[in-house]
Amino acid sequence: RWWQAFNTRYNVYFNGAQAYIDGSLEKEKGNKDNFTELIPLYTVGNKNSRDLGKSNFNRAIEKAEKAIAKHSIKKRPEWTKNRRKTDKDIEWLSRREYNPFLWKAWMLMGRSQFHQGAFEEAAATFAYMSRMYKGQTAIYGKARAWLAKCYIEQGWLYDAEDVIRNMQLDSMDWRAVKEWDYTYADYYLHTGELAKAVPYLQKVIKHEMRQKQKARELYLLGQVYAALGKRQDAYEAFQRVIRTNPPYELEFNARIAQTEVMAEGQSKQMISKLRHMAASDNNKEYLDQVYYAMGNIHLANKDTLAAINAYELGRKKTRSGIEKGVLLLHLGDLYWAKERFGNAKKCYDEALGLLDRDRKDYEQLSDRSKILDELAPYTDAVQLQDSLQQLAKCSEKER
């Protein structure tokens, strides 16, 4: 058993673990978050990031499978019949796996499947682990935590709730608590119970060892506080993001978010800060977001005209992406409310090509765009007639 454990650990498993680390770093480096919405706790929650690191994760899975196939020990150890069995002995003899290191290979396989977005395969792996290591509370607890995460990421919240409820009835091993902090945070974020997510997110941030991921989690905490109306807490969370010295895009978005949660009555200070950001050469790529933030502040102050002007400035910037799509959507909504349907149609048509079809408001956007396809020619004709009539009423000098 010792020799099989040694071989598992230092040969096959080591290579698989290294591939897993390489895949995780590739995913972390290439991940692009959509900062206009709550960012996911795990980068695999971003659909566009799922294929990142896939080849490395596949290699990790292959190595884990090889370790399990070559080094599994199913044979029960011999026991002297006249020797009295303790509870510990009974647990030992009831095990289904006697290689003391092999559970790590199972965990490596399941986590690799999870991070490449193969949630059903990962769930099957962790469910099997749960059955195999039922008597070993630490391993069992970790496997159940990951099983719940698989269900959460698939949107199977009732299944996740069932795993969580059953785990609450069992006595949780202290070595599994860390994994469950992540699971609870992810669960409450997906169910929209943001107030319940906060304490677990705070624990997750303390657990996190990777600097960039910690910065993401702090940003997410700031977003949650902002959604709960806790402006000061949100501002401080975004400030903590900046202090971690994260990649520039994350730092920039944290600074933008700070302007949106500053105390009421500080509109001039917020606008001034955003104008200063717009003047910086470092932010040329992100000007659509700067003007979008300005527009939001004007809109909060019920200055619709100033909001439209700010959004229009952002619209003229060359970058095309989700952020610009959200700006165009909001600008189109303002034009729709003002019955300037020709302008609304242009915004909606451009936004349709930039936004994800999974957005909650995408269907409404699509419906409005179809309505305007039929309505816009008539409204344009009416506006032209109104303009001609106004022109006819003017004197020759005014013309």
Regions found by a protein language model. Give the residues of each.
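Acidic, polar-rich low-complexity tracts and alpha-helical solenoid repeat scaffolds
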Residues: 1-399
